[in-house]
Amino acid sequence: MDFVAGAIGGVCGVAVGYPLDTVKVRIQTEAKYAGIWHCIRDTYRQERVWGFYRGLSLPVCTVSLVSSVSFGTYHHCLAHICRFRYGSTDAKPTKADITLSGCASGLVRVFLTSPTEVAKVRLQTQTQAQTQQRRSSASWTSGAPALCPTPTACLEPRPKYSGPLHCLVTVAREEGLRGLYKGSSALLLREGHSFATYFLSYAMLCEWLTPAGHSQPDVLGVLVAGGCAGVLAWAVATPMDVIKSRLQADGQGQHRYRGLLHCVVTSVREEGPRVLFKGLALNCCRAFPVNMVVFVAYEAVLRLTQSLLT
């Protein structure tokens, strides 16, 4: 049931946090935004509400699988560690056991999420300005003005990617399989230690918030533990998240970065060390409600099934 509960929790989390995720990605990849509110105002003015939901369909379709694998891997890994070390899956795991299982959960996610992350970032950073710039570049290169079949076509330039699946196909055709796994090195570094932090902090907070005489926390305890675990995980994940987003967005025009280290050095040299923490406040603000919902849904499904089976 860990897989089913994780899938339901993941879908609930995406529904809550996607608009702020779009804002976060744009702040991290586009220097024109002075801050969170500037990005929100500019996105709404140019693209209205739909601009905050660009690329949503693919995460919704895949998040159930990814979240299911994350929670399932964590609990199965933890069970195997406890059986190997203590002879029983019911033994209380140590903090090191939880950390190792959480890290394994994060690393497994990368193979599933990298292509969808590339599509999500490309669609989220595909603005009207970029579309217009690409049209102008094509006109300049050809030496002739772009011909518009209709006045509407000139006013509304066609975006490069028409949707998540089209984006994946286009990236694979233009950049090969490596294009779909662009930024996966940064994603590995982000997911490994952030999910170790995520599950360890949740387990510790649940233990602290469990009332005396009870075996598990109440709903309020789960809400607080889940929200705080999400904030702590994103606090340690943000530097690599910035690099990951820049590497994955680096395919909509000139290729600026040769790899992970070059992206880190170039970003810090041009924008200072603070660039690695772009979107940190937004990540933390988004993480609290999203992970409250994820863990409440997850725990609710587990407790419901346990009550039905006993």
UniProtKB/Swiss-Prot annotation:
Disruption phenotype: Mutant mice show increased hepatic steatosis upon methionine- and choline-deficient or high-fat diet associated with increased hepatic lipid droplets and triglycerides and cholesterol levels. They spontaneously develop hepatocellular carcinomas. SUPFAM superfamilies: Mitochondrial carrier. Pfam families: Mito_carr (PF00153). It is found in: Mitochondrion inner membrane; Mitochondrion outer membrane. InterPro entries: Mit_carrier, Mitochondrial_Carrier, Mitochondrial_sb/sol_carrier, Mt_carrier_dom_sf. It comes from the Eukaryota. It catalyses: NAD(+)(in) = NAD(+)(out); acetyl-CoA(in) = acetyl-CoA(out). Belongs to the mitochondrial carrier (TC 2.A.29) family. Mitochondrial NAD(+) transporter that acts as a 'metabolic gate' in hepatic lipogenesis. Provides NAD(+) substrate to mitochondrial SIRT3 deacetylase and enables its NAD(+)-dependent activities in mitochondrial energy metabolism. This triggers downstream activation of PRKAA1/AMPK-alpha signaling cascade that negatively regulates sterol regulatory element-binding protein (SREBP) transcriptional activities and ATP-consuming lipogenesis to restore cellular energy balance. May transport other mitochondrial metabolites having an aromatic nucleotide and phosphate groups, such as acetyl-CoA. This is Solute carrier family 25 member 47.
